[in-house]
Amino acid sequence: FEGAYSTGAQEHIYMEPQGMLAEYDKGILTVYGSMQCPYYVKNALLPAFGFSEDRIRIIQTTTGGGFGGKEDFPSLIAGHAALGSYKTGKPVKIILVRHTDILMTPKRHPSKISIRTALDSKDQILGMEIQILIDGGAYEGLSSVVLQRALFASTGVYRIPNARITALALATNTVPNGAFRGFGAPQAYFAIETHMQELAQFIKQDPVKFKRSNCVDYGDSTLTGGTIKEPVMVDELLAKLKEISGLDPFNLPRREVKNGKIRAYGFSLFKHGCGFTGSGERDKIKALVKLRRNTDGTVEILVANTEIGQGAHTTLRKVVAETLGVPFSTIILNNPDTSRVPDSGPTVASRTAMIVGNLLYRAALKLKNQGTVGEEITVEERYAQPPEIVWDQETFVGDAYPAFSWGTNLVEVEADPLTLEVQVKNFWGTYDIGIPLDERVAEGQMTGGISQGIGYATVEVLQNREGRFLQQTMTDCIIPTA
């Protein structure tokens, strides 16, 4: 059974466009800006200018959204602003207007994914052959990282005995594409979930039952030969989905036509690998965090991770406050300044709470048992790969991620076959995210992700003509709104 599935580009449409301010003064280059990864910017400017580390200082300013769009691109305009200030001796500020931001900045990679599945005489899956093509745009950028995650997500949550996968990022004459929430996984899950739905219909089985019967479980092997090391709570998620929706996922209402409109339900399962893909945390990032207890009893968190509207500061402060057993108000966390904070890694890939939060937890335990009240003391903690997480980057064999979150989605949709208008009438989702460090922050992240997913599937369109997007403003670049 074969199928081909495609997705388009998606604009981040963060509320605040890209912007940088650079100042070269007394041999020191300081750059302020809207960014997710201050050390990415610093590490880009160091070879560009040939300066020593102490001559470049990057300060993140309050940032109005990112979603991956302010991961690597800020380094480009930081370089432009920095060069201007270096040459003129005056401060230089570059703020992109909206149409320029849409024109220049990376988008979610468009994709074309083909899946071919072999079944035995009892309709059991024998294997899959998958081809993944993503549109990288004019330069590689983060395409290799996006391609890896798409590759590792390509068989979804399913137990596939044999798989052969070809994955390519193609150079084209469009804007370079880059990171965007999930970076490769949404494209892959759209393909595999649609394919499994169509496959179930082809063999005349209920799609939800077919998906559940083929789902991986605790102890099973992953696509890359790793192991599912934690309980898979799919049955519990399905039970909760039934409770909150009032609908039995295994017996969903059939498609119906009423008043000339089609009403139907869609269902999907997913898992998401947490943190950097493969050996990124171990070999590239090597995150370092510090905690400093001041003489007045306050404790300052020293990390490079940024608050971009996702609630990172609240979450990290809560981790430290609760571990130390002190009031939340005594924990200080300012926007990062590379002259003061260590490189704890980028604010990407759902790693801030899990990786950096855990490092801060361990640092707080150290601090709790050191020094006396009124004494200034600094402790640090560096990331070390757990010995049970084994990965070979050369062969792509082992545990591509240290842990997974799991989820179910159920959507009720109404479509008008004459006007092609689609309305999402209801949406329900259940997610296994472990222990939420802050329930309001976690709920906000889930709500935001759902909204972006619905928008990507329904109203968000980027039309490309000769390498340029026709959509140029927030008026014609439509996204879901309240």
What are these model-derived regions, one by one?
Residues 261, 273, 281-282, 461-482:
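Glycine-rich active-site loop/lid that clamps phosphate-bearing ligands
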Residues 1-430:
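Structural alpha/beta core scaffold segments of enzyme domains
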